[in-house]
């Protein structure tokens, strides 16, 4: 699914056939390897605006949780997914409300180079959200 999700038609077929809830469930409750692959698939699926909106509507909590406490690879994939979700303006509030800003900020401070790069990119996108601007100002 990870590689297939790069094709827009296949990505839409995955979403329309009910593939998103099981991927979010795996991101939340799967084995370490399943969490990485689920986050990677969701990251690639989130390039499509319609799918990104659906993922955000289903809940970004599992992705934020992976950024906070997943394996090294899961953290990077989940951070990338949050960044892709944030490309859709209306998703930014959901990410902020789920603790995404704090989780990504922590990853920038404590992650490896790849994690830091992905988290910084996601934060740059999130910085355009009023909700995040309020958090930054409050410190």
Task: Locate the predicted segments by residue.
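Detector for intrinsically disordered, low-structure N-terminal pre-sequences
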Residues: 1, 9, 59, 63-66, ...
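Buried hydrophobic core positions in alpha-solenoid tandem helical repeats
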Residues: 22-24, 62-64, 103-105
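Alpha-solenoid helical repeat architecture
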Residues: 27-30, 67-70, 108-111
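Short, hydrophobic/charged alpha-helical patches characteristic of ARM/HEAT alpha-solenoid repeats
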Residues: 10-17, 33-35, 50-58, 73-75, ...
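Alpha-helical solenoid repeat architecture
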Residues: 1-7, 25, 36-48, 76-89, ...
């Amino acid at each position: 699914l990870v590689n297939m999700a790069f094709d827009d038609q296949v990505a839409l077929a995955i979403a329309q056939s009910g593939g998103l809830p099981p991927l979010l469930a795996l991101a939340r409750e799967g084995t370490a390897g399943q969490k990485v692959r689920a986050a990677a698939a969701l990251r690639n699926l989130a390039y499509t605006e319609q799918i990104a909106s659906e993922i955000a509507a289903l809940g970004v909590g599992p992705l934020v949780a992976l950024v906070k406490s997943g394996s090294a690879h899961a953290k990077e994939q989940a951070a990338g997914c949050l960044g892709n979700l944030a490309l859709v303006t209306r998703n930014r509030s959901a990410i902020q409300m789920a603790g995404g800003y704090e989780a990504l900020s922590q990853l920038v401070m404590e992650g490896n180079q790849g994690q830091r790069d992905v988290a910084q990119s996601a934060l740059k996108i999130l910085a355009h959200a009023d909700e995040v601007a309020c958090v930054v100002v409050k410190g």
